[in-house]
From Swiss-Prot:
Pathway: Amino-acid biosynthesis; L-tryptophan biosynthesis; L-tryptophan from chorismate: step 2/5
GO BP terms in the entry: L-tryptophan biosynthetic process
Single GO term (MF): magnesium ion binding
Phylogenetic classification of the source organism: Bacteria, Bacillati, Bacillota, Bacilli, Bacillales
Organism: Listeria monocytogenes serotype 4b (strain CLIP80459)
Name of the gene this protein is made from: trpD
Role this protein plays: Catalyzes the transfer of the phosphoribosyl group of 5-phosphorylribose-1-pyrophosphate (PRPP) to anthranilate to yield N-(5'-phosphoribosyl)-anthranilate (PRA).
Note describing how the cofactor binds: Binds 2 magnesium ions per monomer.
InterPro entries hit by this protein: Anthranilate_Pribosyl_Tfrase, Glycosyl_Trfase_fam3, Glycosyl_Trfase_fam3_N_dom, Glycosyl_Trfase_fam3_N_dom_sf, Nuc_phospho_transferase
Family note: Belongs to the anthranilate phosphoribosyltransferase family.
Protein name: Anthranilate phosphoribosyltransferase
Positions annotated to bind anthranilate 1: 79, 110
Subunit details: Homodimer.
EC numbers on record: 2.4.2.18
């Protein structure tokens, strides 16, 4: 093990198998916090490879609590976080739009690591229980079409790195691979990433992990979401191939806004923003969700273009169907908790 750690310290790449070995040591609690911190920072400085990302993702999935759901039907749209944009909870809001389109959404998420409000924080503020049992998550996916999967709850072995990540206060490989480790076997995925240089290789990793179709995007301003502030870069994985594209908000009939226009706050403020979007209140928040939900619908294959996705997302919000998904989730959750 010391030899493998030294390779990383010496800026040498690890094979998938070598990374799996180190990750297993971490997830079984056999590496000290000091060594974990040194390892994570050395990886960050060196730069994470596709092999390393796949290796640690597979190790995480092996020790995860599995959530049963028919293979090949669900999707996720969570991002890496770590873009320091202090935006509102875009992917969480968009998830209700995707669910309203009839797509089962297994929304993987966590508390804030480098922002003021993570998806788990805003979900709690909305009244969503983030500590459901796996069988309850399955029930909600089946009955409502959306469930929140709290990362520390379904990845209990991550307890060995949570304190280290919080103390480091900077994105690490765990930000990059968190969205890759959903305990539901996904068919499609939209994944925002804060590093534009990793678009192509992350899409390749999703293919290695069994996705049939996926979009990995990096927004203007290097957001881990699609942005209205300029050009968005994304990689589409399909049929074993990856293709790179760009898209501006004007390309799909949306108005440009500066990044400051979608600034969020603490969980209470972000929950209010989420509700205002699902109510259809016009402005930068709504248009940002339309763009991101449009990408999600496109990643899923529900539509053939992002433009069609934006149009469908607008209809789903105007009709009240997206707002109803939030209400249904809370209603059926109470039914589960009352058992």
């Amino acid at each position: 093990m010391e030899i493998l750690l030294q390779k990383v310290y010496d800026q040498e790449n690890l094979s998938k198998e070598e990374m799996t070995m180190i990750a297993t040591e971490i997830f079984e609690g056999r590496l000290s916090k000091t060594k974990i911190a040194a390892f994570l920072m050395a990886l960050k400085v060196k730069g994470e490879t596709a092999e390393e990302m796949a290796g640690i993702a597979q190790a995480m999935q092996r020790v995860a609590i599995q959530v049963a759901f028919p293979a090949g039907t669900a999707m996720d749209n969570c991002g890496t976080g770590g873009d320091k944009s202090n935006s509102f909870n875009i992917s969480t809001t968009s998830a209700f739009v995707l669910a309203a389109a009839g797509i089962p959404v297994a929304k993987h998420g966590n508390r804030s690591i480098s922002s003021r409000s993570g998806s788990a924080d805003v979900c709690q503020e909305l009244g969503i229980d983030i500590n459901m049992r796996p069988e309850d998550m399955t029930y909600l996916l089946e009955k409502v079409g959306i469930a929140f999967l709290f990362a520390p709850h379904v990845h209990p072995n991550m307890k060995y790195v949570m304190d280290v990540r919080k103390e480091l206060g900077t994105p690490t490989i765990f930000n990059l691979i968190g969205p890759l480790t959903n305990p539901v076997h996904l068919e499609t995925q939209l994944m925002g990433i804060y590093r534009r240089d990793l678009l192509e290789q992350t899409a390749e990793v999703l293919g290695q992990l069994g996705r049939k179709r996926a979009v990995v995007l990096n927004g203007a301003g290097f957001m881990d979401e699609a942005s209205l502030a300029g050009e968005n870069h994304y990689a589409l994985y399909e049929n074993g191939e990856v293709h790179l594209y760009t898209l501006r908000p004007e390309d799909v009939g949306l108005t440009s806004y500066p990044l400051e226009a979608i600034t969020g706050g603490e969980a209470k403020e972000n929950a209010a923003i989420l509700r205002s979007v699902l109510d259809g209140e016009p402005g930068a928040y709504l248009d940002t969700v339309l763009l991101n939900a449009g990408f999600g619908l496109f990643a899923n294959g529900k539509v053939t273009t992002v433009q069609e996705g934006v149009d469908l997302a607008r209809d789903l919000i105007r009709s009240g169907l997206a707002k109803q998904k939030l209400a249904d989730l809370i209603t059926y959750q109470k039914e589960v908790l009352a058992k």
